């Protein structure tokens, strides 16, 4: 089956991509570029020869191949990124009719489709944060930025969370009011943001175009007058679409972040909930979002378009940073004023770092599971685990749901602290038998990470995130090479168990 990855792989050669096929179905490949093809490609650009029958037939064949390749590629983009993303990629990336689908065009169209579809592995998760932005193109088109906190983890829809932070002026700004501090207002949802980001003139043209096309379709093209034919050419561009109330709006660029704690994929409710170690602190963001809205009502906070603290982008960034974005990427304030473009770039950097860490965490989990394929390692690890008998899961579930009493939580925190000490002692015991000449740099790095990153009940979310990232990345590098002995495999499993303790303490920290 043809997919986006097949086009990306074929385009790496630098040649144009073509779609062929046989009885087994269509196949994507790089176009043949032999002596004959090179000669005809050269002659097609020579004024005196490009109209020759042979050259013209070759050029027309290439155009037809390029069109077919583009059609199949857009279909593949639609399956992965949705119709809106594929349409945006075609509108902005295809450009010339019959142009070759080469490496640059494939890369650009995939990038555009990803942009309109939304960026981030957290998109299908029940607990997520969405950072939205509309491009800033100067003071006349300043764009916008907003942030939404969603929690649809509970089976009862009445307990779902939808907190939207969208900072606007309470009046239309004049050309000389960009530095004025005026009364703010907050919008309650993304749909209202979309409507606010499309001008009344554009909305009118879109309605006229839609009405003209409907009339021409009903009556026939030959009965349409000149104005109707002119209006019918005004199609919505990528991102411009009607909502369920038949109102036009402009879709935003979207960046998705996971919430720390137990989460699940909304598309697959049968799968068990998994703990997300790297993400944003939902409770802290909700508190700050509500503080911002209270500040708007009380007059403590104002709107100022050119500002580092009181425009839409700075408010969205404020709530994002309240959730711990700076645990992953340091934040650098704008020199004069925050804007949606700078905010979007920072959100992308944070999302990329979070997703990379979570992917590394999942990779460590898979590799450590394979270490147990050895019977001797499995038996030794089972003996160590059964001697402790502690488990992080009950604490994590209870703490994450807020159902454990304070006394029970403290008792389990003490239990986890003892388990941290036990894992550390076991790791040290396994390492004691290795002399200096047998310890390589990776061993030393893992031993140092185990010592520095042991969690405790005193750690807050920032400290636990820092410890988890160091330990996950260090262990991940250590797992790139197969273990030379059973003791080496057991040290890796001990480091993996320490990551599990960090998860348990993290669950308690976000519930506090």
From Swiss-Prot:
Compartments, as annotated in UniProt: Secreted
Keywords: Coiled coil, Secreted, Virulence
Source species taxonomy: Bacteria, Pseudomonadati, Pseudomonadota, Betaproteobacteria, Burkholderiales
Protein name (record): Effector protein BopA
Residues forming coiled coils: 347-377
Role description: Plays a role in mediating bacterial evasion from the host autophagic pathway.
Chief location of this protein within or outside the cell: secreted
Family, similarity comment: Belongs to the BopA/IcsB family.
This protein's encoding gene: bopA
GO cellular-component term (any): extracellular space
């Amino acid at each position: 089956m043809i997919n986006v990855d097949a086009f990306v792989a074929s385009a790496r050669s630098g040649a144009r991509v073509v779609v062929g096929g046989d009885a087994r179905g269509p196949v994507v490949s790089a176009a043949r570029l032999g002596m004959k093809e090179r000669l005809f490609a050269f002659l097609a650009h020579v004024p005196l020869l490009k109209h020759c029958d042979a050259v013209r037939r070759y050029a027309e064949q290439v155009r037809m191949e390029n069109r077919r390749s583009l059609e199949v590629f857009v279909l593949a983009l639609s399956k992965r990124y949705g119709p809106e993303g594929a349409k945006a990629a075609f509108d902005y990336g295809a450009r010339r009719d019959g142009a070759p689908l080469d490496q640059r065009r494939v890369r650009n169209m995939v990038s555009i489709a990803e942009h309109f579809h939304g960026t981030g592995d957290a998109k299908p998760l029940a607990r997520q944060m969405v950072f939205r932005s509309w491009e800033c193109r100067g003071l006349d088109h300043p764009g916008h930025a907003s942030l939404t906190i969603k929690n649809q983890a509970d089976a009862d829809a009445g307990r779902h969370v939808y907190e939207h932070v969208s900072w606007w002026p309470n009046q239309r700004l004049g050309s000389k009011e960009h530095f004025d501090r005026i009364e703010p207002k907050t919008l309650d949802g993304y749909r209202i943001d979309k409507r606010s980001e499309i001008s009344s003139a554009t909305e009118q043209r879109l309605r006229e175009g839609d009405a003209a096309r409907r009339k021409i379709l009903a009556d026939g093209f030959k009965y349409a007058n000149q104005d109707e034919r002119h209006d019918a050419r005004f199609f919505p561009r990528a991102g411009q679409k009607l909502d369920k109330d038949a109102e036009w709006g402009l879709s935003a660029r979207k960046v998705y972040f996971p919430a720390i704690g137990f989460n699940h994929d909304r598309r697959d409710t049968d799968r068990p909930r998994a703990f997300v170690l790297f993400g944003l602190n939902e409770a802290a963001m909700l508190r700050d979002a509500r503080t911002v809205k209270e500040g708007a009502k009380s007059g403590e906070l104002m709107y100022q378009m050119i500002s580092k603290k009181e425009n839409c982008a700075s408010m969205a960034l404020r709530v994002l940073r309240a959730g711990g974005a700076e645990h992953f990427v340091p934040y650098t304030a704008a020199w004069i004023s925050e804007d949606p473009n700078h905010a979007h770039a920072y959100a992308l950097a944070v999302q990329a770092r979070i997703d990379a860490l979570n992917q590394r965490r999942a990779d460590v989990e898979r590799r450590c599971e394979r270490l147990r394929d050895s019977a001797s390692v499995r038996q030794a690890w089972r003996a160590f685990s059964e001697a402790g008998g502690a488990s992080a899961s009950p604490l994590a579930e209870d703490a994450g749901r807020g159902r454990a009493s304070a006394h029970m939580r403290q008792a389990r925190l003490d239990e986890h602290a003892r388990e941290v000490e036990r894992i550390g002692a076991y790791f040290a015991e396994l390492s004691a038998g290795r002399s200096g000449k047998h310890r390589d740099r990776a061993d030393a790095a893992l031993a140092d990470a185990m010592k520095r990153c042991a969690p405790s009940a005193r750690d807050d979310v920032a400290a636990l995130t820092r410890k988890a990232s160091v330990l996950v990345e260090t262990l991940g590098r250590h797992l790139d090479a197969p273990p030379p002995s059973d003791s080496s495999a057991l040290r890796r499993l001990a480091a993996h168990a320490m990551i599990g303790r960090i998860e348990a303490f993290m669950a308690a920290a976000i519930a506090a």
